A protein has these predicted regions:
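Short alpha-helical segment of the dimerization/phosphotransfer core of two-component systems
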Residues: 63-71
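Conserved catalytic submotifs in the C-terminal HATPase_c
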Residues: 89-92, 111, 116-126
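Short beta-strand/loop element within the Bergerat-fold HATPase_c
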Residues: 152-164
């Protein structure tokens, strides 16, 4: 019985390793043609300035190329997380600075979609973390909020220190999450049959959760259908200057 169990475990391990390697190889192979397609599409856009119908098609193709590029990048990140090849380089970082970097990243989208991104938190709170990966985790939550929030609505990013723990909350007053989905949203590639978002690929939230857990934290979600959602990141290692 023990030998059978060991064989089963070994076989499962090999299968997972094969899938990781395959995903990583495919993702790397896609990067070069994607870069070329983006260049070609840029040339087409410049050549169709006086052809509005064709110009619109090049803009749409650019959006789809961007979507594929995000998928490839997220697949690579997930694969690296699974393989344990990511080295978290923690330093003391100012939380407000990180959140303002995120605000700048989404400023154009907020203006284009007529949505408001609001920041709320003390300027002197710090966190022992990997700056790049923590920004990635919060940015994915903010992107998710934008994807599920209509024009005229708002997304709020709030951070606060509670004892030696930092809590970051990304809250929106968008469509909310259906009760059937609430326990599945952190599963990879999960797509809700109730969601109006047809562009999402189902990797952003699982990636954020994995990054937070690598930092020794946890992530929770609260949502009311039709009223909005709040994603909460809780991490130890916070101090106030």
């Amino acid at each position: 019985l023990v030998s059978v169990l060991n064989a089963h475990i070994e076989n499962e391990f090999r299968t997972k390793e094969f899938l990781k390697d395959t995903i990583s190889d495919i993702s790397h192979q896609l990067k070069t043609p994607l870069a070329a397609l983006n260049i070609y599409n840029g040339i087409l856009q410049s050549e169709t300035e006086n052809l509005p119908d064709l110009k619109e098609f090049t803009i749409l193709s650019e959006q789809e190329l961007d979507r594929i590029e995000v998928l490839v990048q997220n697949l690579l990140k997930i694969t690296r997380l699974d393989a344990g090849s990511i080295i978290i380089e923690k330093k003391i970082e100012n939380v407000s600075d990180m959140m303002h970097d995120i605000e700048q990243h989404f400023a154009y989208r907020a203006k284009q979609e007529q949505k408001e991104l609001i920041l709320s938190g003390d300027d002197d709170i710090t966190l022992f973390c990997d700056r790049e990966w923590m920004i990635e985790a919060v940015s994915n939550l903010v992107k998710n909020a934008f994807d599920h929030t209509d024009a005229g609505k708002h997304i709020c990013v709030e951070w606060k220190q509670m004892s030696d723990m930092l809590q970051i909350v990304v809250e929106d007053n968008g469509c909310g999450i259906h009760s059937e989905d609430i326990y599945h949203i952190f599963k990879r590639f999960y797509r809700s049959r109730f969601s109006k978002d047809t562009q999402g690929i189902g990797l952003g939230l699982p990636l954020s959760k994995a990054i937070v857990e690598l930092h020794g934290g946890n992530m929770k979600v609260e949502s009311v259908l039709g009223k909005g959602s709040a994603f909460m990141i809780n991490i130890l290692g916070s101090t106030k200057l």
